Amino acid sequence: MTRLYGRVFGGQRLVDAAPHGHWCSTTILSSIRLDGSTAAMVIEGATDASVFQAYVHHILIPSLRPQDIVVMDNLAPHKYPNILQMLERAGVEVWHLPPYSPDFNPIEKMWSKIKTYLRKAKARSSNALFRAIGRALRTITAADAAGWFQHCGYRYIQS
């Protein structure tokens, strides 16, 4: 990822190097908790139902606690019955957001912070990108998460 904007003093030209080439896509599957912790998985390429199912089974469910609420948007794999059954067996409640409602999704705020970090990191290889993603995810704090949940209209009881 490259930065989209920059600043310089008046009368100077902004110069930055951005490679030109054909890139493969990288997908980050992640969750966020009020304490700022995440359960993330990074893959090269796009995701589908089988990849999302593996994420839920091996990464997300082990990080969940009974009585947790999992909020998901309307991406097709989020609605597959076997994924919903796995989450129900884990003892969590599943909420689906209305269509086209990123304003209600706190993880969208997290992606904004992650993307800003990744643009600044200027990773130019898969390994460098994976390391940068790990560092970016570790920058998420409990204060960030609480602010994002509050901004999206969620009310919660602090323990």
Segments predicted by a language model, with ranges:
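Acidic/histidine-rich, metal-coordinating catalytic segments
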Residues: 66-79, 100, 105
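RNase H-like polynucleotidyl transferase catalytic core
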Residues: 14-20, 90-106
